[in-house]
Amino acid sequence: MGCERKALILMVVIWIMSFWTLSLADISSTEIAVYWGQREDGLLRDTCKTNNYKIVFISFLDKFGCEIRKPELELEGVCGPSVGNPCSFLESQIKECQRMGVKVFLALGGPKGTYSACSADYAKDLAEYLHTYFLSERREGPLGKVALDGIHFDIQKPVDELNWDNLLEELYQIKDVYQSTFLLSAAPGCLSPDEYLDNAIQTRHFDYIFVRFYNDRSCQYSTGNIQRIRNAWLSWTKSVYPRDKNLFLELPASQATAPGGGYIPPSALIGQVLPYLPDLQTRYAGIALWNRQADKETGYSTNIIRYLNATAMPFTSNLLKYPS
């Protein structure tokens, strides 16, 4: 009887260690994205030089629609109409980031601004504008003469017209016609389906989905409780078309940047959250941080990288008990 009990204990320990090894392998390739575009964020080139990020979202193109003559790029305190300083000086920094292997996306929408995809015809015009002035280097646009790596749909404002699927479809067709390599991504809220982007997501044209797991108590992390975020993640793995490693968790880099909650300390993210997310091995690609300023203040991305580079054994005891 004693030998059987010891054998059972050994089997359990082996299972736990194999689970831990697999989980660590799954998250060790974590890619980090960050939103950049405020005065306190520092220089774009310096953001890329940290080597912490694989993707930078220039945020935001947040003024466009049928009643707006020309789309406007507003980088708070950096450049744009409110500052009275054009953003074309960023051209050299964008290209420097790209030479370093950092993908630079243009983020549409955001929490402020005035924007809408007000009709199917306007969606087509906007797609052509984005391709001409941001994605092709064909003409000098608000960021200079650039070919950005992608367009990011960060739609957070209630509008009557929801033609985001039309805009996505037009961009996808442009990509096909010109044999372009630019990427398309979205940042829906953690509650699935997303009220603004669900139709667009169902087109299956997004390369990456960055799910916002904050400012929504129904599906975000709270201290010591991962059940809501786990359930939301599972819902997204089922509702989003299967594509290898195309789901990111978008998280606040500090408590202050998410007044509605959802902040996850780096140690808890690596030790208590990620290892318990379903389909991690096939669907998880990394995390996105809101925003660069907060990351500078807290060192969130640096801590994530430090934990990933370590053996992570300090967190083993946390894995022996499923968090509530």
Swiss-Prot record:
Glycans are attached at residue 309. GO terms for biological process: carbohydrate metabolic process. Residues 1-25 form the signal peptide. The keyword Signal applies. InterPro entries: Cts1-like (IPR045321), Glyco_hydro18_cat (IPR001223), Glycoside_hydrolase_SF (IPR017853), Glycosyl_Hydrlase18_Chitinase (IPR050542). It comes from the Eukaryota. One of its GO terms (molecular function) is chitinase activity. Keywords: Glycoprotein, Signal. GO terms for cellular component: extracellular region. The keyword Transcription regulation does not apply. Residues 30-311 form the GH18 domain. May act as a carbohydrate-binding protein. Belongs to the glycosyl hydrolase 18 family. This is Concanavalin B. It comes from Canavalia ensiformis.
